[in-house]
Amino acid sequence: MARVGIMETAIRDGHQSLLATRMRTEDMIPILEKMDAVGYHAIECWGGATFDTMLRFLKEDPWARLREVKKRLPKTQTQMLLRGQNAIGYRHYADDVVREFCDRSVQNGMDIFRIFDALNDTRNLATAFEAVKKSGGHVQGTICYTVSPVHTVDKFAAMATEMVGMGADSLCIKDMAGLLSPMMAKALVTRIKADHPEMLLQMHCHDTSGYSEMAYLMGVQAGADVIDTAISPLAGGTSQPATETLVAALSEDPELATGLDMGLLGEIAVYFKEVRRRYWKFESNLLGIDAGVLSHQVPGGMISNLVGQMREQGQESKLPEVLLENARVRADFGYPPLVTPSSQIVGTQAVLNVLTGKRYGNVTKETKNLAKGMYGTTGQPISAEILQTILGDEQPITHRPADDLQPELGAAADEIGDLAENIDDVLSYVMFPQPAREYLQWRKEGGGPERELVAAVIGAMFVRPKKATAGQAPVLMAANGAVEQWKSYGRQRQMR
């Protein structure tokens, strides 16, 4: 019997990390039957940035994707990433929104909810925990791992115990920046499993620093039950380590073997290798190991964002200075984990501090809200000096931020009107008002068939029967007939 379970991230975090979350549902559907037969513990297929990207760029219904994927995975659990009170958006939502979103997610086919808060503030997890359990879903309480003087094994273990008391069905150590060292993985897993031997413990690591395979090995030897991996064509860099590599390595120890079908994994890898080539335009620039993250602690996606901001200002040469300032801003704010939305808040403020030449001379609204406690409490209290600089005489709140929010669903339903065909559409609108409205209007006006025709025409205008260049050839060679080739290429032109 398999001792270590594998959660496959290819159709969520794999392409989110490497291909800007652009993989379309039609490129997932053909391989799901084989993925279902592999023997995965779960397949991550939803949440994170997928919802926003589908509405904003792909003109797809996120709820329809979930239903289509679930329909093709009768043997395998589905899993998603939920940002606590932020759900799958970028701000705190009222409790009625979070409850309805969790219930509708279960009804549409979601099994396991990995629920985290960017600041590790468990008050921001409570409503989602309660809602998922009430709807019959599985609650995975999540620790956002980070490195700082205040983030110790004791602190993380205390959070795990608190989440167990809140009703978590399993626990996860989420290492979004690739900072979890092998020794810390061993220490943290050992402690949590000693405190809660009955709880399934899962590890989620990114390969940014090159630590992840070693951290996984030490973790499973210490008692971790499940690890997250991505099939090899969508692995490495800022994604997870390769599924096949970990399966093969663990198979050498009968007590750790996963029991996954390596033959099927090979076939799945061949499929996704071809799929990835269709998305060459969206390839990440961060494909290899970045050991620098071990010092500056900035996740790969956040570095891309910082580079973009500096490039817009013609100040790319100041990136090293921004990375140093990023660490200072993070320390000023009590060492929040650098994950959405705290990573964007800290990073943008660091850029402003460097470009203006005056620390906190220009403060963003989000920075002010972080200081006010509008996102929750940070790893340690923010110093009085920083609070005075940013807030003046205004006092930060001490209660749960969402307690100040009034119910939102009723007003949202009135605003979107008959563009929404059901409550799922209303939820999409609440999360992403403008992208959802544009998508729902497009759908009402006909959507699909016209888009296919336009995509084919655009593709036909740009495709040329010339010798293919490296990286682009698969886009033109992989489809089933000329029109399909044009559509594939044309869609990517539309996503610009």
Which residues fall in each region the model found?
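Alpha-helical segments flanking ligand/cofactor-binding loops in enzyme cores
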Residues: E33, D103, E130, T161, ...
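Terminal or standalone catalytic/regulatory effector modules within metabolic enzymes
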Residues: K34-M54, N285-V293, Q297, G301-K466, ...
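Glycine-enriched alpha-helix->loop->beta-strand junction motifs that scaffold or abut catalytic
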Residues: G39, G109-D111, S135-G137, G165-D169, ...
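Active-site beta->alpha loop and helix N-cap motifs at the rims of alpha/beta catalytic domains
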Residues: A42, G47-V164, L171, G178-S181
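Catalytic alpha/beta core domains of metabolic enzymes, predominantly
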Residues: M176-N362
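Ser/Thr/Pro-rich, acidic low-complexity intrinsically disordered regulatory segments
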Residues: K466-R496
